[in-house]
């Protein structure tokens, strides 16, 4: 095995800070005068945590001989005996022993696309917890497939293009039958990175009724959209989901957040057991470049959609060592270093998340899954110095089996300009969008963080992991961190407040969300709570600043890694499009599954500090805060 030498890729802590005048992601939609926020549907999900579930299922009869999918199916049938549904083909058992099964409600054989039911089965084979957003209103009596009075899918495509002002030419579009019921692929279009698609589905509307819609999928680079166009009126759009998540940060190498924290060093064979083929092979082919099973990294100065033939540094002896200087300009002069850095950070994070349970069955990003479950052929496509934008980054997360795509931009906020690939926190934040979108709602559903509050938590998880990874041995609970400070050339970073356990430094509370209308702002509130949680667990269990956790019976033995594990396990437990209260309950349930609730009161105290305590309630316009603890704490 050849040693892999990566210059400038030392373990780096990641963080992202913010200033009051927060920068917002720019993309195709916003540049074309379209506000995607106006198309978001409200949260519908309910979550029954493990305590409530234990009481409910006492009256239900389950056979000891049932497998976990059968047990989950029986629960759905007993909860909604008059509903029809299908099992989504993405169930798996997590590393914490919890089985995760997802269901999609149907009507007349068509999916109700935002009607989901997730069931979590414990090690004992019993229902552990569950959540759902099933439609409870009246199903249309008439089967639309009989009279077929709905519009042609081509009209729906044209309606989506017009409503969202998309850069897609559809005048000559023709619909070709694809796999699935009433599913089509469009030929004869230009402007999209891949052929647009459409399939006929129902959608729950805000008024509580069902709409028959064409779900039109268009990948236009900065936005990878699912547009729900009314099947009877192609000028009406009911909802838009964007697989692309944007952020505002930048970084350098593992343990080092950016070039201000250290110098490039050479690291030999940095992969862990999570990458059995190493980082430069997919088990079938060995690559003398920045390509392997988990990721493929390349230069993309034009911002184009192709990547296979793009430039990558070549090294037959697998020594990727290239010069870099903080005064070097333009960034393209050190593109070899940049691509290598991005490749290292992406792979290193893949391996860490794998140890926490984001593996093949859970929907991670790999070409070759080695018969370990999940769908392969979906490494992360990571573009360095992408020319399609500046001062930002994004990550597109399609369902398991399709590659994720990260675009890292240059930042014009300093002279010389700075390269986002060198701020690890930005890379980690972006990749975390892939993690949360694959886990929440199951690997086959990447549309479970598209409401305002759940989308905000998606941003918050990215900031949390970026910050947790950058912690230093000298840090204490009084240490504050920013997000994206180096890339933005602003010590305050790109968030409204620093991440701090001090309520004077960061005054965000649960009820602060009542006045926030943007996902990065809401995400800062959520990440602030998780930052408090991390320090509470560090105080309870001690902190280790090694790159990888030490496990005992599947439990990380230090508070920092334990917080990362519990937060990740909570993503898989919570319902599709959760709110803060449900995500908190899912973290508590994750602790019950992993440690038998050994950290219950510690977790409650951390959330109660910022008003998400016992008795806190969700209401889209008037959230109720609480600093109380439950009985027994």
From Swiss-Prot:
Molecular function as annotated in GO: metalloendopeptidase activity; zinc ion binding
Main location: secreted
Active site: 430
Subcellular locations according to the entry: Secreted
Gene Ontology terms: cellular component: extracellular region
Residue positions assigned to the propeptide: 19-246
Keywords tagged on the record: Glycoprotein, Hydrolase, Metal-binding, Metalloprotease, Protease, Secreted, Signal, Virulence, Zinc, Zymogen
One Pfam short name: Peptidase_M36
UniProt enzyme class: hydrolase
Protein name as catalogued: Probable extracellular metalloproteinase 3
Job of this protein: Secreted metalloproteinase probably acting as a virulence factor.
Binding site for Zn(2+): 429, 433
EC number: 3.4.24.-
Species: Trichophyton verrucosum (strain HKI 0517)
Taxonomy of the source species: Eukaryota, Fungi, Dikarya, Ascomycota, Pezizomycotina
UniProt cross-references to InterPro entries, sorted A to Z: FTP_domain (IPR011096), Fungal_virulence_M36 (IPR050371), Peptidase_M36 (IPR001842), Peptidase_M4/M1_CTD_sf (IPR027268)
GO biological process per UniProt: proteolysis
Cofactor-binding details, from the entry: Binds 1 zinc ion per subunit.
Recorded family membership: Belongs to the peptidase M36 family.
Sites where a glycan is attached: 410, 480, 622
Endpoints of the signal sequence: 1-18
Needed co-factor(s): Zn(2+)
